[in-house]
């Protein structure tokens, strides 16, 4: 089939979505469907290390119910007690079982294969944490897995600690120092802090941390305090400073134990005899380094006081401010009192402070929003989506126009950056089948709401619909499916509202979804299924379990959802479209096996996981039974993600330790 015909088909289908979206569908083809009454796969395949690793990923999904949600202390900070931040016991037990299964299966393999699979496990560990590029952005689950790996490969885990900064951030070191009891890991984390702070001090002071005197630190502090933003930027020009000074805990603040242990680690014992003096010297050094970084929090005070930093709220450069900083201080930067509507007279100034610099800060922020320069890519999609959802479900009652614009701008930046990355990847590796021909399918059944993952499903679905070659096309389903065409000219709040206008909270009738889609395809004379279905779900449309070792038992296969869908598509003259099962809730049943052709599996909430769906080189393949599918399977797709060159340093470090199977 020519590319012209393929483009024509997905264009026709996109047009059909637009027409159909005005009418909510009523599926007359289903006569009866019990809630969670279908069969599914009980395992990802035969007992192999690859299947165990994929099972681990399937369960490495941050639970949204019954998990860490500690209350703030009186000082406004969260407690550092590790018991307050933990993975639920049921999930720990589940993960423990799967990890041990991997260990047992891998230990029985030849040494070269052991090396291969343990290298993949360690790559996966850092993929689990990866904040930049494709990865799951998970903290607690990464800490859990890192500790499990340390129990098997202590020397290797210790050697990998410095790499954590490349995939996570300095706060991860704080967790290791406080919560992991192994002294080798704690020392490695403290040494990593020292390495970066020494490098920063060499650039700023011309000497390492312990050689900087209090007089030098005070002098530079005073000099920097008097500088304007542009002058500070000129001072640090050409210097590559880390964020260690920003993240190392402050005295009297959360995780201050890290600071105490670091001082004991970094400074000679003789110096520590006058500990109060060392603390004071260290404080001045860190303050100077933080000023060099242009940290926004330091400017969130009105200048003019003797000895204070002469950079105020108006000095914050909104187009350079990190997405997390903007999200955390959104109301303050907008100069708005939370949940207090602005009067007409306050629209330009805000209603929180009358200080000139606070008002200018608001104006600067609004200007940056209008120019489309506000950052949002690195935000936690789940947190951003839940903030949007909160306002949508309260009918936007306490949402100011400025806050709406700010949240929408950060959403748009996130979407735009992912689309740019996807387009660049596709251009670099053209595919016979364009991987961007994707239709998101959002499960809005009652179980999604019970698991509290419905908001994440909507967010990922809308994000996917925005970067797809079928822009705005998506399907929602509960008992009945709804064909939607999301207006891409509307902001994300309006898009959420459009999705929420459909049927929600009933049973999980996924069969009605593909039947409705087939009706649409046939009615509009679409000649091929040259698209992918990205199904965002908790997987609870199945309850019973069936074990199909290789997926070749046709009668059994036709009883599971994937088999039923393929049969229905074939009856209408279509091949099974590439199908992505996006799992949003850790559970023990699977919608396919690791080798099922035409299928991919994605697990988690990170927006960057969309890269594995919208990128890749795909062709068609026909098996001995005559089934034509896209030539991809869950294991191959997963393997491609974790063997990305970004994780090569992890593999190289494993080989360098020569520990166990890496010898």
Predicted feature locations:
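Long lumenal/extracellular ectodomains of secretory and single-pass membrane proteins
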Residues: 2-456, 466-663
């Amino acid at each position: 089939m020519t590319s012209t015909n393929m483009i024509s088909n997905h264009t026709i289908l996109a047009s059909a979505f637009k027409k159909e979206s005005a009418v909510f569908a009523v599926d007359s083809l289903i006569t009866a469907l019990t809630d969670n009454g279908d069969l599914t796969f009980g395992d990802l395949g035969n007992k192999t290390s690859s299947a165990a690793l994929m099972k681990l990923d399937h369960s490495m999904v941050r639970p949204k119910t019954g998990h860490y949600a500690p209350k703030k202390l009186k000082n406004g900070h969260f407690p550092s007690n590790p018991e307050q931040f933990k993975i639920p016991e049921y999930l720990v037990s589940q993960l423990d079982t799967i990890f041990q299964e991997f260990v047992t299966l891998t230990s029985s393999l030849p040494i070269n294969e052991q090396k291969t699979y343990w290298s993949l496990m360690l790559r996966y560990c850092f993929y689990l944490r990866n904040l930049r590029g494709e990865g799951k952005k998970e903290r607690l689950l990464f800490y859990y897995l890192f500790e499990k790996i340390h129990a098997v490969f202590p020397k290797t885990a210790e050697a990998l600690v410095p790499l954590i900064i490349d995939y996570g951030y300095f706060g991860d070191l704080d967790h290791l120092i406080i919560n992991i009891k192994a002294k080798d890991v704690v020392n490695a984390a403290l040494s990593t802090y020292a390495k970066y702070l020494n490098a920063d001090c060499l650039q700023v002071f011309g000497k390492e941390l312990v050689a900087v005197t209090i007089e030098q630190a005070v002098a530079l502090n005073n000099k920097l305090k008097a500088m304007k933003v542009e002058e500070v930027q000129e001072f640090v020009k050409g210097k590559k400073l880390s964020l260690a000074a920003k993240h190392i805990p402050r005295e009297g603040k959360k995780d201050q134990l890290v600071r105490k242990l670091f001082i004991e680690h970094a400074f000679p014992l003789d110096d520590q005899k006058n500990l109060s003096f060392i603390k004071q010297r260290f404080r001045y050094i860190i303050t100077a380094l933080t000023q060099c970084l242009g940290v926004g929090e330091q400017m969130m005070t009105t200048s003019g006081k003797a000895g204070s930093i002469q950079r105020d709220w108006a000095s914050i450069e909104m187009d350079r401010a990190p997405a997390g900083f903007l999200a955390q201080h959104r109301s303050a930067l907008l100069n708005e009192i939370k949940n207090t509507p602005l009067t007409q007279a306050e629209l330009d100034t805000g209603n929180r402070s009358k200080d000139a610099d606070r008002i200018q800060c608001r104006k600067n922020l609004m200007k940056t929003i209008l120019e489309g320069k506000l950052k949002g890519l690195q935000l936690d999609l789940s947190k951003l989506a839940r903030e949007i959802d909160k306002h949508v479900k309260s009918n936007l009652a306490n949402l100011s126009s400025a806050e709406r614009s700010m949240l929408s701008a950060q959403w748009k930046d996130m979407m735009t950056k992912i689309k740019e990355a996807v387009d660049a990847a596709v251009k670099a590796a053209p595919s016979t089948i364009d991987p961007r021909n994707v239709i998101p399918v959002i499960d809005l059944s009652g179980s999604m709401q019970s698991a509290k993952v419905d908001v994440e499903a909507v967010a990922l679905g809308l994000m996917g619909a925005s970067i797809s070659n079928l822009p705005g096309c998506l399907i929602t389903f509960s008992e009945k499916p709804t064909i939607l065409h999301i207006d891409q000219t509307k902001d994300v709040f309006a898009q959420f509202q459009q999705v929420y206008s459909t049927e929600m909270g009933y049973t999980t009738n996924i069969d009605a979804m593909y039947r409705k889609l087939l009706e649409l395809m046939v009615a509009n004379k679409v000649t091929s299924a040259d698209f992918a279905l990205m199904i965002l779900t908790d997987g609870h449309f199945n309850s019973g379990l069936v074990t199909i070792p290789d997926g070749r038992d046709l009668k059994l296969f036709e009883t599971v959802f994937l088999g039923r869908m393929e049969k229905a598509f074939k009856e209408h003259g279509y091949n099974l479209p590439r199908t992505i099962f996006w799992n949003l809730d850790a559970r023990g049943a699977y919608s396919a096996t690791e080798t099922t052709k035409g299928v991919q599996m994605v697990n988690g909430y990170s927006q960057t996981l969309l890269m594995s769906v919208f990128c890749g080189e795909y062709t068609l393949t026909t098996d001995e039974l005559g089934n034509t599918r896209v030539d991809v399977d869950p294991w191959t797709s997963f393997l491609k993600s974790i063997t990305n060159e970004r994780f090569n340093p992890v593999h190289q470090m494993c080989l360098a330790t020569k520990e166990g199977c890496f010898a």
